[in-house]
Amino acid sequence: MPQQNEFTEYALLADIRTADVQNPQELAAIWGPIRKECTEAGAEVTDSYAVLGEHDFLVLLDAPSRDVCFKASLIMERHGLDVQSMEVVPTEAFGKLVEDL
């Protein structure tokens, strides 16, 4: 459980809603506003990747709470993306969690 001033990392899988995006240039242009709006909501988009496979994008996000991550997901939804968010733990931290098992 993060302490009060710590951020938790989230991985968000995002898919384009084709009816909302008309061309690839429009899609590339949404990331600036998404980053700005997420920052204003208290989250930081640390990385984003275009993905080959089942999903269109992977977004890594730091947020102080689940509620802030939820707000960031809704911001992305407003920009034409369907988003699935998951809390992630670095493998080193995971190793420490399970070392006594």
Predicted regions span which residues?
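Short S/T/G/P-rich N-terminal loop/turn motif that feeds into the first structured element of a domain
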Residues: 1-40, 44-46, 93-101
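A generic structural signal for short beta-strands and their flanking turns/coil linkers
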Residues: 8, 41, 53-55, 79-81
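Short, well-ordered beta-strand segments in beta-rich or mixed alpha/beta enzyme
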Residues: 11-15, 49-73
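A structural preference for short, hydrophobic beta-strand core positions in alpha/beta folds
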Residues: 47-48, 85
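An amphipathic, aromatic/His-enriched active-site/gating alpha helix that lines ligand/cofactor pockets
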Residues: 63-92
